[in-house]
């Protein structure tokens, strides 16, 4: 089995390819574009003897990268970052080292795969998170407005805040 571990980022990925029988991995840097990902996957699938398995830590790429790799014929696992074993004293982090470390753990079978949601579940989850974030932002801004008014001596005492009556009172200031 050829193992491929990717340290993923928004703009580019560092890829460590562990071919069977080779101790030293091949290291690639790939732009995070459809064309470059396709080219990298096809190249590895062509060069590898037998099965190829890709992995990367869940994060900024979501599950789109997994779906893309699998659409090009590769098998890809998304790894739970919170369950990746960490050695004490490992403080120097580079993309290259992270990719090699992930490859080593992947080859040893020490990584835990997360279940990828289907695209509809992922879209629903994204929408729910965006809505929650918008609600929190709205609440924070409302508190900031009330604190600003209070610092300038304007305190509303005729009922609940953010009612039509309260908003009319603010407009009249």
Regions from the PLM with identified roles:
Residues 50-59, 102:
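Acidic beta-strand-to-loop metal/phosphate-binding motif
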């Amino acid at each position: 089995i050829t193992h491929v571990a990717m340290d993923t980022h928004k703009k580019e990925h560092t890829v460590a390819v562990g071919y069977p029988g080779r101790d030293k991995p091949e290291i690639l840097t790939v732009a995070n574009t459809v064309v470059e990902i396709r080219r990298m996957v096809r190249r590895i699938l062509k060069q590898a003897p037998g099965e190829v398995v890709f992995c990367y830590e869940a994060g900024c790429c979501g599950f789109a990268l997994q779906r893309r790799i699998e659409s090009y014929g590769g098998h890809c696992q998304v790894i739970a970052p919170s369950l990746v074993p960490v050695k004490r004293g490992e403080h120097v982090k580079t993309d290259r080292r992270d990719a090699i470390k992930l490859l080593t753990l992947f080859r040893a079978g020490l990584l835990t795969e997360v279940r990828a949601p289907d695209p509809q579940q992922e879209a629903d989850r994204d929408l729910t998170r965006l809505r929650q974030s918008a609600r929190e932002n709205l609440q924070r801004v409302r508190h900031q407005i009330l604190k600003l008014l209070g610092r300038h001596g304007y305190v509303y005492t005729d009922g609940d805040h953010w009612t039509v009556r309260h908003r009319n009172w603010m407009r009249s200031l």
